[in-house]
Amino acid sequence: EPEKREWLKFAFTDPERLKPSQTRQQLTEQVAENFAELSIRLRKSGHAPPAVAHFINRLVFCMFAEDIGILPNRLFLKLLDAAVKSPESFEHLSAQLFTAMRDKNGFVGFERVPWFNGGLFDSAETLPLSGTELKRIRAAAKLDWSDIDPSIFGTLFERGLDPEKR
């Protein structure tokens, strides 16, 4: 496999090239800051702090679940790709996904969606996002969330309630 041979070559000839551009901590901090900014914008547009915190945790959970393989076929990234092209569709598309995630026999189109219990997806409630916000979320979704510290969930929930928290 050419890619593996290339990595092996770099291990001996250019090991610096194999170092991640950001540490796990730096990546987690960057993501937390981006979502804190989103939280502030959503609260300023009149959404209640608990609804903002819950919504942001849903988004982050979807990204994490996708990258560890429990949300199939890049389903959330595909949703974001469609919503970036048509921002007014985001609420409908995300509500469909959230509904499927709370259903033991959930589907989005022809895609089977695993059931996620625990309360995060008890409702299909979602919040509207602008095209710019959707592009930022899509950029975040393209990161490898398996490299991000899972403790970010608690941090983002707290920031959704009070964005001034660090």
PLM region spans:
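Preference for the N-terminal adenyl/adenosyl cofactor-binding alpha/beta module
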Residues: K4-R166
